[in-house]
Amino acid sequence: MRVLLTGFEPFAGELVNPSWEVASRLAERRISGCTVAAERLPTVFGASIACLRTALERHRPQAVVCLGEAGGRAAISIERVALNLDEARIPDNKGQQPVEIPVEPGAPAAYFATLPVRAIVAKLLAAGIPAEISRTAGGFVCNHTFYGLMHHLGQATPVRAGFIHIPYLPEQAVRYPGKASMELATTLRGIEMVLEVLRSEQNVL
């Protein structure tokens, strides 16, 4: 199975983004029958979707997993739904801060992920890795990209796709007292297990 794994460039003054740290380390590897390609996306409204579409054309994946940073979350969060709404709390890396703007004007209000969400969470929890189903990907570039991905693929595509938020790395969280973090090795193992489930689980739950 060909899998496209994406992460984002750092934003909001951070020097690293754990989503790209994970995706880049899994690139060009074969994991449980999955061949992984990785692409780094800009943390920029509009440009992230354009770059993702180019990557889809280049790699022709059978599954797509977009990763993003969710500072403050303590678990790997498997996103259930992408909303057709940009609601930025902070500016992106080009200074854009859209509020109450649709990602795709005239398109459906939401799309559901086509990953086996419950099976993924169950697998991670069984391995002792904190995981949860999330019903909001926020209003920043992560949700924007997630919605753009699902809209581009459409409902009839055989390509399964979704979005996963991961916590800060410890070196990031130390700057924010009380914020949760997750060791890179743990997050890496968690995303490897996501790929294992993708390969073996055909249901979307």
Swiss-Prot record:
EC annotation from Swiss-Prot or TrEMBL: 3.4.19.3
Matches recorded under Pfam families: Peptidase_C15 (PF01470)
Record keyword Metal-binding present: no
Catalysis performed (reactions): Release of an N-terminal pyroglutamyl group from a polypeptide, the second amino acid generally not being Pro
Localization, UniProt: Cytoplasm
UniProt-recorded Gene Ontology molecular function terms: pyroglutamyl-peptidase activity
Gene Ontology biological-process entries: proteolysis
InterPro entries, per the entry: Peptidase_C15, Peptidase_C15-like, Peptidase_C15-like_sf, PGP-I_bact-type, PGPEP1_Cys_AS, PGPEP1_Glu_AS
GO cellular component terms, semicolon-separated: cytosol
Record has Hydrolase as a keyword: yes
Description of how the protein assembles with itself and partners: Homotetramer.
NCBIfam families: PRK13197.1, pyro_pdase
UniProt record similarity statement: Belongs to the peptidase C15 family.
Stated role: Removes 5-oxoproline from various penultimate amino acid residues except L-proline.
Name of this protein: Pyrrolidone-carboxylate peptidase
Gene that encodes it: pcp
